UniProtKB/Swiss-Prot annotation:
TM segment ranges: 7-27, 48-68, 95-115, 121-141
Location in the cell: Cell membrane
UniProt cross-references to InterPro entries, sorted A to Z: DUF2975 (IPR021354)
Keyword field contains Cell membrane: yes
Keywords assigned by UniProt, alphabetized: Cell membrane, Membrane, Transmembrane, Transmembrane helix
One of the record's GO cellular component terms: plasma membrane
One Pfam short name: DUF2975
The name this protein goes by in its record: Uncharacterized membrane protein YoaS
Membrane topology: Multi-pass membrane protein
Length: 160
């Protein structure tokens, strides 16, 4: 792969991470305060929302880091290695983790949507769940294909 294309993809990864970081810094506190206003009788809801949203950001950034490592392996001509397979496996697990976290949090989204009469909150949660699952399936397919390609390559290297 051309080095410029991997540099472009690395820049794209950074540009994907920056808005999520901005959301974590600026929007998460507002959402937590808003949830505390919606549920004044549940004192700990603000901190629960804080923890929930920040914990879901951890696998996202870990997956971005793994994608960055994968692009580095491609730059070093180590694309067909066990390291690449492991990076794809980690990306798959991160995507599944994000889906599980948001699926577990959907009841809170539902309650917020019911109180505020905003069904868009539920749609946002569902979009995040399904997008993460699509990424997980795509990473799993790529992982399997890469593993098979590595096996074929090693067989060809042994037959020479």
């Amino acid at each position: 792969m051309n080095r410029m294309s991997t540099i472009f993809l690395k820049i794209a990864l950074v540009l994907i991470g920056i808005p999520i970081l901005a959301l974590c810094i600026f929007l998460v506190p507002k959402v937590a305060n808003y949830s505390a206003e919606l549920f004044p009788n549940i004192a700990y809801i603000k901190y629960l929302v804080f923890i929930y949203l920040y914990v879901t950001a951890i696998p996202f950034y870990f997956a971005l880091y793994q994608a960055f490592k994968l692009l580095s392996y491609i730059d070093k001509n180590k694309a067909f290695s066990g390291l690449s397979v492991r990076a794809l496996k980690n990306i798959k697990y991160c995507a599944v983790t994000i889906s599980i976290f948001y699926a577990a949090g959907m009841p809170v989204f539902y309650l917020m949507a019911e109180i505020d009469d905003a069904p868009g909150i539920i749609v946002i949660g569902l979009v995040i769940i399904f997008a993460s699952m699509v990424i997980a399936v795509f990473a799993a397919v790529l992982q399997k294909l890469l593993k098979e390609a590595i096996d074929i390559k090693s067989e060809n290297d042994l037959t020479v």
